[in-house]
Amino acid sequence: MSKRILAKQTAELIGQEVKLMGWANSRRDHGGVIFIDLRDESGLVQVTVHPDSKEAFKLAEGVRDEYVLKVIGKVIEREEKLINPNLETGTVEVVVETLGILNKSEPLPFAVSVGPENKEEQNVGEDVRLKYRYLDLRRPKMQHMLKRRAEMYAFIRKYMEANDFTEVATPILANSSPEGARDFLIPSRFNPGKFFALPQAPQQFKQLLMVGGVPRYYQFATCFRDEDTRADRLYGDFYQLDLEMAFVDDGEEVRELIDPLVLRLTTEFAGKKLTFKDIP
């Protein structure tokens, strides 16, 4: 047994020895038995350390929130009265045979973990969140947002490819072009006194693609603009779905492509009701 499994898989592996790795979400000492809620990218599972596993128990006594742990143990069913209906893995627990501390954690500047019974997250100022970004990214809300963004990207890719678009990543180091804001300039080491410009938009490149025989192009473009912060974008860089179509007679063809995409993104990812007549 050498392969690591995820917390959510434990419910299907009753009676088997498993290896888990993740963060200590919380630790409780109940009458000499130590319970640790182990968290990984799939969720939580309770691991139980008994005093007869002397080495593991000694280590478990010193475990604190956000310690990174390696657990080897046996999955067993919980007694009916101990089942936690608020937890996906609440019908099982892992009885620890071997416990390893992969990394310790200093006292936390804010709470990272959120228990299954408490869905509320601590209200933390943005300046603190950005200073400890690696901790902020562990919070359930941030994990959810990152996964939803990845799902949205996958949805858009599938939609664009179904409509015969080709995804092309265009260059980041380019020459300056007339756009609506100032360029970010990067000195060229090989050409003293010369500069690259970070693209405000991939306009020149997508026009080259149209001429070059790629009539339907798209990408998730990173755009760089030296302009004041706006309500819909941060200073410096932002991301957009960029696309171009050749051989189009009028705007109606573009609307027939974009309207269904906007409709589905709004309803499926923003959770808002929208109909075609709502789209201007």
Language-model features, listed with the residues they occupy:
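Class II aminoacyl-tRNA synthetase catalytic cores and aaRS-like
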Residues: 1-280
